[in-house]
């Protein structure tokens, strides 16, 4: 009986491969099946660690949402900068028509190499996204934002016309079409979304995101980004303190949280994160206001240490590598060995 089942299965598999191409169905225990997920760094050391794989996963849909001026676009521009550092190609679908090239450049984005589209309708934006994804030549596509993806019927209609559920239907249809192409081309697609208030909610959070529920289901990672305070020097505001919560994560354990500083005209402060995580792991010693590294004093007060790390990038890189090894690579190697044991058990 078992033998007949095996014969029937192998006949079905060969029929599927003939009809739909090699690799349509694979055994998870096969050595050819990649279990490793490629990631693109977010530009934030703490967030890379919170995501569990060292960044945002390629071949997946990611949603980043939060209130206005919380750092959503800044975070996505940092992702573009990191992607370009690795020699990748990035595209920015600017549905809000609000991209500032000079600000992007300050964050490290190679503006001359960035593909930008400012579509007229939501349908056009999503069609352009699909074509870029299917080309398999683009590594990251950012859609800014879901709220600005206005259906054609709404644009061509009168001001007071009712268009209930049009945008949600558009998103649902587009994501059904996009999701398989994204996986096949190994492209990271990031949707930036805004927050709206639900009326008449008595219990639970009244907050919701725009564009219906489809994106919540299709996204492998959802990030909730909030501004929690200001960074001041005297009366002058230099930037904002930001908190990011990993609300959903299909590639690693979710609900992790991290905080980082976004400095105006500079972006996410890598040095501040290195100081915080370095102190946490006892790589940097803190005694009163003084900070020491390898028994050498490197500055008094966090701001002076930040400037020291900025002027000594080799020290910053060394510390970052130690932090990544301690918090990320050790975890990943444990997960990898556990996963290999699991697949060996399944194969047996």
Curated annotation (Swiss-Prot):
GO BP, sorted A to Z: DNA recombination; DNA repair; SOS response
Subcellular location(s) of the protein: Cytoplasm
SUPFAM superfamilies per UniProt: P-loop containing nucleoside triphosphate hydrolases, RecA protein, C-terminal domain
GO function terms (MF aspect): ATP binding; ATP hydrolysis activity; ATP-dependent DNA damage sensor activity; damaged DNA binding; single-stranded DNA binding
S-S bonds: none
PROSITE patterns: RECA_1 (PS00321), RECA_2 (PS50162), RECA_3 (PS50163)
Gene Ontology cellular-component annotations: cytosol
Protein family: Belongs to the RecA family.
Known role: Can catalyze the hydrolysis of ATP in the presence of single-stranded DNA, the ATP-dependent uptake of single-stranded DNA by duplex DNA, and the ATP-dependent hybridization of homologous single-stranded DNAs. It interacts with LexA causing its activation and leading to its autocatalytic cleavage.
Protein name: Protein RecA
